[in-house]
Amino acid sequence: IFPNHAAQAARDRRTRVWTGDVWKLHRCLREVRPDLFLLPLDTRPTGLLLIAGLDPGNRVLWDRYNPVVKNFRDRDSEVPPDAVIAREGAVDPGSALVTKVLEELRDLKARGPAPREVVGALRALSRGRE
């Protein structure tokens, strides 16, 4: 989700390490699915996005797919903003926060709560980060 330079973010592959326009996914999910917990991780070569709180019954993206894709293609340039290249807001995967989030996910899985409860618990752990 984090291209290292604009060439890696091109829709057509021109580099060995390539992300295409997947860098738009984080912003898209933040806007279209605010019910999810999103934690961008600063991993090499192109980062990861931890997504939690998924509900298999949620049809928001399915129902709005074409308008969402058109919106992000039309309004976002093909060149990622400097903040994306700089990985602003990304968390070191070895940080205590990531460890806590993964432990909480393990514990939550054992209890089987609803997706909104999962998101609430993870957001409480990461206050000030989202």
Residue ranges of model-derived segments:
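S-adenosylmethionine/decaboxylated-SAM
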Residues: 1-129
